[in-house]
Amino acid sequence: LDSWGSHEFEAARYPNPQAMLDSVHAMNGRFMISVWPKFYDTVKNYKELDNRGWMYHQAIKDDIHDWLGFRGSFYDAYSDGARKMFWRQMDENLYTKYKFGIDAWWMDASEPNVRDCTPMWYRKALSGPTALGTSTEYFNAYSIVNADAIYNGQRSVNPNQRVFLLTRSGFAGEQRYSTATWSGDIATRWEDMRAQMTAGLNYSMAGLPFWGMDQGGFCVENRYVAAQQEFDR
């Protein structure tokens, strides 16, 4: 719970990850795991990246804690060295460690979403400066450089296995890194589902072919329940 960014299975819940992966593959299944570009500031991987100047510091300076109550931040994916280190940490703790048993990567929060429900000006402050320049100029491209880290990282280790990434944010040209994008966490309302159809069409018209959505919604929306009950009566 308190080791976000360690890329390690929690031993109490997953005592034998290799056996779990092997059993999934024995049933002709495929295994995808969610990995965020996020690190609590107490974990080893954070400290390794931070020692090279590859962590964003504003969230730490502002003492921002996430919904679990811990403090952390995101790595600077615009740095080639940071991308290589990020992949190496994933490889050592997940990919090569478990005999290439991870078949796909769910790269969540790749907007980047350092903090939920945050004005754009503060999102940029939390996500920079980057190795390329200000986050005002480069913010939207985070998803593609993060995808670069995993795609080229996995190919360098095991060029014979197909790479597949599911991302929560997209950018022009990102399909070159074997990505599919879904539209993120939506409410369980019909109007939200309809809005995703429009979003998906526009996304695909930009030349990005693989897109999806939370078909059943992600979060229950209660704002209109009381009004609906009044109408029903």
Segments from the language model and where they lie:
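Catalytic-domain carbohydrate-binding cleft regions of carbohydrate-active enzymes
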Residues: 1-233
